[in-house]
Curated annotation (Swiss-Prot):
Residues 1-28 form a transit peptide. It comes from the Eukaryota. This is Cardiolipin synthase (CMP-forming). The lineage of its organism: Eukaryota, Viridiplantae, Streptophyta, Embryophyta, Tracheophyta. The keyword Signal does not apply. The gene is CLS. Its cofactor is Mn(2+).
Length: 341
């Protein structure tokens, strides 16, 4: 009994000496204090056996694994620090900012699911206007680019009259202005950010009327070969007829007005997009017509040879353009035609 009392006094003395050390260790362990469970989940039997003597053996000096239960080992050796949700909020805000930038640059529709974490409701009336290719998709006919295209269309019959009356110099100047307007209407539309559905039909139609009128008048004056003019006119008629036929098949031959036929006032109007080979062909045709107009007043046998070469070039690009549109038509043919075939 005397030995037990002496050991107990020795333990109490050591406990007083080591109390500041354990207090400091516990304070530096973290800002959150955890209350250990009554029994250790990993060693329940071991904790139950030592529980009567734990108040005497825990504060002893020496290694921690000999004097502390498992949960106190974790608190003393590995401090716990709870991280706040500030970093998570910052990541969410950064994600929203990136998604907004992506939508503003690429104009992705919200139906694709690229929406921010915090909902942002934006309602757009699709029947009023639609933004495409950097400009407003407008249905109105009255605008500057369409007026330029209309002036080029009207210039075709005027140039026909000039060539028929052998006013070649005046016809050349008029053709130069009309040819420049083919570039000008597109430039003005881009500068004014006008994306007109009617203009997409009017621009190629004006080119065909201009070239057709001038070519027919030049055949009458023996300035161009009739075979070449026939190829050009047949190609234009085939393109216009094929486009109308394809549109009618898509509508199942049912429409009320021409506005419905061309879908000018629908939610997704169909524009006419010319191929690159067609634009190149138009440039070669205008160059040939301009050179042939000047041939009677300023030409010679050498220039006539160059006009012959250019005529063959125009015939080649005309047939190549026709073939390219045929391939495009075959790829975009209606589903009803695919089922029939």
């Amino acid at each position: 009994m005397a030995i037990y009392r002496s050991l107990r006094k020795l333990v109490e003395i050591n406990h007083r000496k080591t109390r500041p050390f354990f207090t400091a260790a516990t304070a530096s362990g973290g800002t959150v204090s955890l209350t250990p469970p009554q029994f250790s989940p990993l060693f329940p039997h071991f904790s139950h056996r030592l529980s009567p003597l734990s108040k005497w053996f825990v504060p002893l000096n020496g290694p921690l694994f000999l004097s502390s239960p498992p949960w106190k080992l974790l608190q003393s050796a590995t401090p716990l620090h709870w991280r706040g949700n500030g970093s998570v909020l910052k990541k969410v805000e950064a994600l929203n900012l990136r998604l907004d930038r992506i939508r503003s640059r690429t104009r992705f529709p919200r139906q694709l699911g690229l929406q921010s974490v915090v909902p942002n409701i934006l309602t757009v009336d699709r029947n009023d206007s639609k933004e495409e290719d950097g400009g407003k998709l407008v249905k109105s006919f009255v605008n500057v680019p369409n007026m330029i295209s209309m002036a080029r269309l009207v210039s075709g019959p005027v140039l026909w009259w000039m060539i028929s009356n052998e006013m070649y110099s005046s016809a050349f100047l008029g053709l130069a202005v009309s040819g420049a307007s083919d570039w000008l209407d597109g430039y003005v539309a881009r500068r004014m950010k006008i994306n007109s559905v009617v203009g997409s039909y009017l621009d190629p139609l004006a080119d065909k009327v201009l070239i057709g009128c001038v070519a027919v008048a030049m055949v009458q004056k023996d300035l161009l070969h009739p075979g070449l003019v026939g190829i050009v006119l047949l190609r234009d008629v085939a393109l216009v007829g094929g486009a109308v036929y394809l549109r009618a098949l898509n509508l199942d031959w049912k429409w009320k007005t021409w506005s419905d036929f061309f879908n000018l006032d629908g939610s997704s109007p169909q524009k006419v997009e010319p191929l690159f080979i067609s634009k190149v062909n138009t440039v070669f045709q205008l160059t040939l017509v301009a050179g042939a107009i000047l041939q009677p007043e300023f030409g010679n046998p050498d220039t006539q040879t160059w006009i012959t070469y250019l005529s063959w070039l125009v015939a080649s690009t005309t047939m190549a353009s026709t073939a390219a549109y045929g391939v495009q038509y075959w790829k975009k043919r209606p589903i009803s035609m695919i089922k029939r075939s």
